[in-house]
Swiss-Prot record:
It is found in: Cytoplasm. It comes from Vibrio vulnificus (strain YJ016). This is Elongation factor P. One of its GO terms (cellular component) is cytoplasm. Belongs to the elongation factor P family. GO terms for molecular function: translation elongation factor activity. The modification N6-(3,6-diaminohexanoyl)-5-hydroxylysine is found at residue 34. The gene is efp.
Length: 188
């Protein structure tokens, strides 16, 4: 297995810690006035999603996780598994509900998602940054109702609920940022 020095740590690097794949969220190099320098690292375990803070002595090495990120198109769900297809090889991969997690509300058929594979098995599914979904339920916008401009909740075709401006009506297609679950704009 390949190893990486703490001097090469950066956000997004995937490591094996306690025999589990993890990704570095933040890395801070600390050189105290007295004593040895160290790295304070915030990591997320890819299997459980837990966020931890660890410290590594400067110059230590850590094993690089053997994980692959591949782009696949979402096909369908059969109730138990979510099926994805590679557009070049037409190979299909099934991910369980644990790998998809809360991102299930952003899965739209034929959208390209990023799957993280470890030992050939999907451990995480990342939807595209923006998806276009239809509003299936929201309160009607009343003319002149401008007090509290926070918007109103709207239920989308996948079941996700986001806050939208008052002028959005049922049946409109809107663009949503999947990272923050925020309304971006109307789709024309």
């Amino acid at each position: 297995m390949a190893t990486v020095s703490t001097n090469e740590f950066k956000g997004g690097l995937k490591l094996m810690i306690d025999s589990e794949p993890c990704v570095i969220l933040e890395n801070e190099y600390v050189k105290p006035g007295k004593g040895q320098a160290f790295n304070r690292v915030k990591i997320r375990k890819l299997l459980s999603g837990k966020v931890l803070e660890k410290t590594f002595k400067s110059g230590d090495t850590c094993e690089v996780a053997d994980v692959m990120d591949i782009d696949l198109d979402y096909l369908y769900s059969d109730g138990e598994f979510y099926h994805f297809m590679n557009n070049e090889t037409f190979e299909q991969i099934a991910a369980d509900a644990k790998a998809v997690g809360e991102n299930v509300k952003w899965l739209v058929e034929n959208n390209t998602c990023m799957l993280t594979l470890w030992n050939g098995n999907p451990i995480a599914v990342t939807p595209p940054n923006f998806v276009e979904l239809e509003v299936i339920e929201t309160d009607p916008g009343l003319k002149g109702d401008t007090q509290g401009t926070g918007g109103k909740p709207a239920t989308l075709s996948t079941g996700a609920v986001v806050r939208v401006p008052l002028f959005i009506q049922i049946g409109e297609v809107i663009k949503v940022d999947t990272r923050s679950s925020e309304y971006v704009g109307r789709v024309k």
